[in-house]
Structure formats: structure tokens, C-alpha cells
Amino acid sequence: MTHMKLFSALACLLASLATPVLAQHRADPQKLTDPKSFSMILMGDPQGYVKYDINQPLFELCTAWCADNKERLNIKAVLLTGDLVEQNENIVLNRNMLNQTSRQMWEWASHCMGRLDGRLPYIIATGNHEYGYVRGDEPFTHFPEYFPVERNSCWTDCLVSAYPNREGRASIENAAFEFAEPTWGKLLVIAAEWAPRDEVLDWARKLCESEKYAKHTVVFITHSFLYQRTAERTANENYRIKPANYGKDIWDKLVYPCSNIRLVLCGHTGSPGDFEDSVSYREDDNSAGKSVAQMMFNVQILGGGWEGNGGDGWLRILEFMPDGQTIKVRTYSPLFGISPTTRQFAYRTGKCDQFDIIVKP
């Protein structure tokens, strides 16, 4: 009897301690506008976070937020537009633009993405700063060393195709991932290397046109495709890496001919100034007369310019509505959302920040 009384008292104590914990609320709990939707999270170029040690926790906050909101937002994948690091292979610190070596930046980027390993697939279109010594002029990269396919178990079931990188190595620099959702059918997300070679575009085109994937809705992610504000397509950029294709050629050789590529995501461009100087958007019809949404989102100079905090934590929630053709775009910052003091600034509400993309059959 004494033991039973002791057990009951202990149970009551634990219950009383647990109640306040269960009653607590997240700083800024997220939810979908429709509970039957699913989402993908778009993160712009994170290089500004990793190049200064003081900025680095902001990148981890973003990836941790994605992992934490997996169920609430029914997140299927995290998409990145490239430039995980500021410099691929450099040991000389330029205090005017960074205080981390390339190895330190790669290690931190890997650490932050590790928040998603085993939780969510993440799909990265590598940028110019992942290649060469400092800016993407040469073809070598450390990307496959830090992101081998074995590191994230969530890739196992959705990775369906890959193409060798510029060094002839097997890598997810050029990779395709398949998702199946009741309301949207089958989706194919393809990521391509920095300034993709013709053979990469040929691989992606043949994949899209193949019998297996011809009826999929395709999302294509590449680093350089649109300029900020004007949304003009990039062309003939001043990099020594060859062969190379930029926005105009990618449109002509891949996106326009493929009837099922309906969304293109990119980063890369931008200039200090207003938020509008870090984003752009346009729609054009492809060869089949179907609209193709094209969106540039690059956070690196938000939060204080080139030497600021790396992006203020801004990311985009892409909510795929249950009608099977509407994608709601919302621009959100976990950095502002995590504190009640700044929560009112966590969502941007301008015309370029929240809008609908309609993907008609």
C-alpha cells in the first residue's frame, strides 16, 4: 500500500511538472493555409551566413526551423539556389569580406545541412562559389566530399537520376528527385551544376521527355537564370569556366522545349538596396503554350549588404494547394519569428513577397 501511495504521489508530481511544458507555445507556430496542402521551402544563397563566424548561427536557425516545421507545414523538401560557401578553395582571410577559410565554411555549411539529414531531403543547385578557388572560374569543387549521397537517408527513395559533375565524379550536383502527392500527382525536381554544360542540359531534357517522366510536373533549379528586379535572363557572364550555359541558353536549350518544366528557381544575382533588388519573377509560355513560372530569390545581401548578417533569415514557403495547380508563395524569416519582440516583422507582405503561381494543366 505504501508503494502504491508513493507511486501515485510521484505520478501527480510528474503530471504537474509536465503540464506547463505542454501548455507552452512555439514563438511563432506555423501552419498551412489549407491543411490538405504540402510545402517545399526555398532558401536563397546562404554564403553570407557562413563567411563570418558571427553570422553562422543564422544559417543553422533556418535549417533547424525547417526540420522543426516538417509536420506542421507538411514539408516535402528543402530547395537551395546554391553558393553554400563564399569560396571553395582559399586559405587567405580577407577581413573586408570574410573571416573563415574555405574549409571552415564548408564544415559549417555541412553542419547546418546536417539538421535535415534523416528528416528531409534537401536539393541543392550548386553555385559559382562552390567551384574553383574563389569565384567559380575553375571546374573543381569540394561539394561531393561534404555531400555524398549516403549522408542523408531521405534521398534513398526519391533520388531517381544523376549525371557526373565537371570532374567526372558521381555527385548530386546534377540530380533528379521524384515526389508523389495525391493532389498534384507526380513531381520531378531537377537540380543542375553551376553554369551547366550542354551535356547536363541534354541529360535533363531527355529525362523530362522520357516516357517515365513525361507526365510529371517538373521543377528545375539552377544558380544563374534571372537578374534582379528586371527578371531578364542572364547571359554571357564574366567567368572563365567553360563550357557553360546561363539563363538565356538554359531557357532556349532546356526549359522552352520541355513541355513539363513549369517552375524554374534560381539565385545568384542581386545588389544592395531594397528587398526588390534581391528578387525577381516572370512567366513565359514554353513550346507547348504552357506557362512557366521563373523565380529568383537571393538573400545574401539582405540584412546589411555584402558584409551584413547574411540574409536576415529570409526564406520562402511554397505551399502547394490541394487544387493541384496553385502554389502560394510566402516570404518568412525564422530569425524575426523566433522572438515575440520581432514577430510582427516575420512575414513580408509586399507584392513581390506573397503571390500565387498558377500551374494550369
Model feature map: region roles:
Residues 36-39, 72-78, 117-123, 182-188, ...:
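Loop/turn elements at helix/coil->beta-strand transitions in domains of secreted/extracellular proteins
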Residues 37-50, 185-195, 221, 293-298, ...:
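Active-site-proximal beta-strand elements of phosphoester/diester hydrolases
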Residues 24-101:
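N-terminal active-site segment of His-dependent metallophosphoesterases
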